[in-house]
């Protein structure tokens, strides 16, 4: 455990969507002056269950509905938030499948933000390979990719 004073838990829920081309959907974002790449998802709201929170995040960000396929990972070590050092992250990852097609634009190049929106995020498919680990920014995402991407890739 860290020596810093932890004031709050920050519960995050993420969905990994794979396609037939051995790719996983990732999101590139810019916030607080930082650029980062992660799996789609976000923070749980008070009074919300994990599955409902994940489905809400996908609807908000990608304008699509998903079903939960299976639980992949829950953080089992201390991780401070990159944006709020006094917050301890608890991250839960699921494999998801689409109920209907994604309406949001899927980009080809990283950080291809639209000039017409204030929110800087864009989605793209990333090849399920060792290079995925270099593309992901946050330690828990890298751990999930390392532990589960090869297994899921073989199931596709």
Write out the residue ranges for each language-model feature.
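NUDIX/MutT-family hydrolases
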Residues: 106-142
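A generic structural micro-feature
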Residues: 5-9, 36, 84-90, 115-120
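Conserved Nudix-box catalytic region and its N-terminal flanking loop in Nudix hydrolases
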Residues: 23-60
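A short coil-to-beta-strand element that immediately follows conserved catalytic motifs
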Residues: 65-74
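Charged phosphate-binding loop/patch that engages nucleotide di/tri-phosphates or the phosphate backbone
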Residues: 134-156
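Conserved N-terminal beta-strand and adjoining loop/helix that marks the start
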Residues: 2-24, 43, 95
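Short, charged/polar surface micro-motifs in flexible loops or helix N-caps
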Residues: 18-23, 32-33, 45-46, 74-79, ...
């Amino acid at each position: 455990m860290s020596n810093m004073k932890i004031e709050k838990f920050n519960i995050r829920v993420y969905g990994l969507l794979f396609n037939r081309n051995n790719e996983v959907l990732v999101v590139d974002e810019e916030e607080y002056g930082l650029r980062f790449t992660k799996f789609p998802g976000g923070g749980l709201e008070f009074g919300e269950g994990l599955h409902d929170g994940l489905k809400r995040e996908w609807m908000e960000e990608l304008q699509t509905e998903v079903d939960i396929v299976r639980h992949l990972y829950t953080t089992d070590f201390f991780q401070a938030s990159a944006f709020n050092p006094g917050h301890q992250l608890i991250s839960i990852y699921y494999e998801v499948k689409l109920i209907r097609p994604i309406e949001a634009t899927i980009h080809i190049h990283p950080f291809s933000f639209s000039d017409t929106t204030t929110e800087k995020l864009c989605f793209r498919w990333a090849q399920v390979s060792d290079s995925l680990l270099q593309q992901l920014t946050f330690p828990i995402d890298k751990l999930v990719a390392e532990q589960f991407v090869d297994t899921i890739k073989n199931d596709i």
